[in-house]
Amino acid sequence: MESMLNKLKSTVTKVTADVTSAVMGNPVTREFDVGRHIASGGNGLAWKIFNGTKKSTKQEVAVFVFDKKLIDKYQKFEKDQIIDSLKRGVQQLTRLRHPRLLTVQHPLEESRDCLAFCTEPVFASLANVLGNWENLPSSISPDIKDYKLYDVETKYGLLQVSEGLSFLHSSVKMVHGNVTPENVILNKSGAWKIMGFDFCVSSSNPSEQEPKFPCKEWDPNLPSLCLPNPEYLAPEYILSVSCETASDMYSLGAVMYAVFNQGRPIFEVNKQDIYKSFSRQLDQLSRLGSSSLTSIPEEVREHVKLLLNVTPTVRPDADQMTKIPFFDDVGAVTLQYFDTLFQRDNLQKSQFFKGLPKVLPKLPKRVIVQRILPCLTSEFVNPDMVPFVLPNVLLIAEECTKEEYIKLILPELGPVFKQQEPIQILLIFLQKMDLLLTKTPPDEIKNSVLPMVYRALEAPSIQIQELCLNIIPTFANLIDYPSMKNALIPRIKNACLQTSSLAVRVNSLVCLGKILEYLDKWFVLDDILPFLQQIPSKEPAVLMGILGIYKCTFTHKKLGITKEQLAGKVLPHLIPLSIENNLNLNQFSSFIAVIKEMLSRLESEHRTKLEQLHVMQEQQRSLDIGNQMSTSEETKVAHSGSQQIDKVFNNIGADLLSGSESENREDGMQGKQKRGSLTLEEKQKLAKEQEQAQKLKSQQPLKPQVHTPIAPIKQTKDLTDTLMENMSSLTSLSVSTPKISASSTFTPVPSTGLGMMFSTPIDNTKRNLTNGLNANMGFQTSGFSMPVNPNQNFFSGTGTAGVTTMSLGAPPTMSNFSPLTIPPASVKQPQQRPTDMSALNNLFGPQKPKVSMNQLSQQKPNQWLNQFAPPQGSPVMGSAAMGTQGNVMGQAAFGMQGNPFFNPQNFAQPPPTTMTSSSSASNDLKDLFG
């Protein structure tokens, strides 16, 4: 890779050095910038041809440079001869002006190192094209290397050379003297032009007389650049030292032979023995037959044979050659007409341009682009000719690539886009709009092409508007969306609303209907459909156009009309239009069919929506019910603790002792009945208790209330004395007062993490049993209003002097807690003064009146207390021991295991022991209650 770059660098450096050394110091460089070496030409291909530009005008030129280093091998006088010959040829060319002669734009300039002059832009010499690459750069351009002449180029090129010779012979009275492929130059447009007048001979006779051309004898001692090319020189020039116009015609025949024979001349000449070679050549020419000219086309073969005739008078002259049938080819005639176009009037031009589209497809693209297109675009300056020239230019543009179109055609069309007269220009552009939008760059479309379309829509001519509206749908897909939305559509709508022509209005609606597919759905709904309601006319064609737009929008997959639009705007507009009196039966049927289709879809879509909403509502309703149930359960669980605590402590006097299951109470009642019948008073109290339980059951659950603790009043109170007094009062109960035994069961209470102190007198002693509860915690006591006897002992039967001990049932073991036990009777407790129990009155709130055990056992279960009751059928505690003889009944101890507040996780209680009847206890009750 590096070696390739170095090679390329050296090549570029060498070429630059060659150019610099070739023209350095030459006055030509003051006015022209010399570019790349592209070709070679002139006698012996001694002139190097460079492309260049004029500094002042940036006009493209060709710079011919002769480097004097080429003749360093010659003697000074020989160098001078060569330089003089070259100068003479350029000076003669500069004086002559003809379309078939190379045009000189800057005369010859000489410097110490070179000769240089400038001409019209040049492609190459005919010798280069035919394969002679002498004096060309080492890297030959592919344009020259791969160049192949088309038949039309060859025909018209030879015709041009013939016309050039005709001009020299007839008008100038001059013999060229060296007509060779090296002296035929192909310019940038492909035209063949003559140069190399180094050996031209002018007539020595006055113009009114027969021309006579003096001839110099061939001097083999002169340098080759001082002699014409003998391979194309007529035999008489060497053998008889005569020169006339027929000599140039022989040279033309030799050139024609070389063109059709891949650049090889008809005879090879030995320059060392020129006379012998020409003598042999003369014999061959005299016997020249058609078999020797097989490479030449048959239609021109005889004419070439005549041109190569040894007798000069037999050869056709230049004017005759221009008229041979070989040059009557349609392509050659067309190119010839273009070369003489400036001589024609507008009528002749218009007739020629009308027939040109039939000829263009027969011509090669290179010929069209190089020769015809420049001639056509040059006529754009003539407005009257534009309608005739423009179709041909656009036809050529179709065959060009996008790059060629942008480079060669678009710059010439720019001024034409802005021409409004004649009106045919606009029509032609509209008909070829798809071509323009396809090959024109977006910026030029926005700046040049679309403004022309907008002018057509706003043109006063109805025909122009109709044509524009008919053509727009054919290229709508090529227009960018912003331009269509913001510029094209508003002008179409404006043309529809403001025109007085029914045809324009209908065509506007048809145009809109055809370009709907290129528009956005919401733009159609918000802009196009409301516009339809603004159209004032009610002609059937207009109404059907409106219906067509509605139907196209409604049925198109990309567009569609929402049900809101259908119900609110479309149907209210279509239904009144459907009953217009101007509509016939078929048109009315079309309206009704579209309306029914819209109604059907409206019904289907809205029904589907409502069904979906209904399903969603049902699903949401079921979810809401589930959420409410779960919320209710969570609320119950959340409030159960506080509600249960309130109920337990508000009913601590009664509910705490009657919290067993209903089945357990029935078992207790059956046990009571087995032991004996209830008294009337007990039955009354039991009935009241049942009524109270019924009220409690029907009462709404309590909600916890925020309780603001009240600051304790600093007051000294002797709790010990109060407790001792209450304890002493328990021993002095009268016989007529009903005594209540301990509850057969104890209902657990759920723990809330709070503590409370309970003190119980046993054996007439003040004894503290602590279960770990905090006595300072207050509870709301307004939940229940059942009376509690303030003198009741909650953990044993009524206090009597005969009670000596209590049997405590051992409940199941609970983790982290041990059961509370009561010391046996054998342990003598210290005697203390009676305990004042008034403090408990304040602690437990309002007390309830005493009730019997049977009444408590008949109480209906409470839905909250049942949570703390032992399971159905579980054993219950025994009744308290009574009597002075010390009869003792076992009962479950109220300890830490029996307290539900110490087991907040679950409320399952150990199975209580079954109550056993005692005959002594029954007798004591009979004595106690009469």
Curated annotation (Swiss-Prot):
Record's compositionally biased regions (Basic and acidic residues): 680-694
Changes after translation: Could autophosphorylate in presence of poly-L-lysine.
Any one GO biological process: negative regulation of canonical Wnt signaling pathway
Subcellular location: Cytoplasmic vesicle, Clathrin-coated vesicle; Golgi apparatus, trans-Golgi network membrane; Endosome membrane
Annotated knockout phenotype: Disruption of the gene results in perinatal lethality due to impaired neuronal functions. Mutant animals that survive to adulthood show growth retardation and severe sensorimotor deficits. The neurologic deficits in these mice is associated with the degeneration of several neuronal populations, most notably CA3 pyramidal neurons of the hippocampus, resulting from excitotoxicity. This is associated with excessive expression and activation of calcium-permeable glutamate receptors at the synapse.
Phosphoprotein found in the keyword field: yes
Residues where Phosphothreonine is found: 708
Low complexity composition-biased segments: 695-705, 897-922
Cellular component annotations (GO), alphabetically ordered: clathrin-coated vesicle; endosome membrane; Golgi apparatus
Record keywords, A-Z: Cytoplasmic vesicle, Endosome, Golgi apparatus, Membrane, Phosphoprotein
One Pfam family this sequence matches: Pkinase
Region (Disordered): 658-706, 895-930
Main location: cytoplasm
Modified residues annotated as Phosphoserine in this record: 658, 677
Annotated tissue distribution: Ubiquitously expressed.
Entry-linked CDD domains: PK_SCY1_like (cd14011)
All residue ranges annotated as the Protein kinase domain in the record: 32-327
One GO MF term: signaling receptor binding
Positions of HEAT repeats: 443-479
Domain of life: Eukaryota
Family, similarity comment: Belongs to the protein kinase superfamily.
Subunit organization: Interacts with clathrin and AP2B1; the interaction mediates the association with the AP-2 complex.
Entry function: Component of the AP2-containing clathrin coat that may regulate clathrin-dependent trafficking at plasma membrane, TGN and endosomal system. A possible serine/threonine-protein kinase toward the beta2-subunit of the plasma membrane adapter complex AP2 and other proteins in presence of poly-L-lysine has not been confirmed. By regulating the expression of excitatory receptors at synapses, plays an essential role in neuronal function and signaling and in brain development.
Protein name: SCY1-like protein 2
Species of origin: Mus musculus (Mouse)
Phylogenetic lineage: Eukaryota, Metazoa, Chordata, Craniata, Vertebrata
Gene: Scyl2
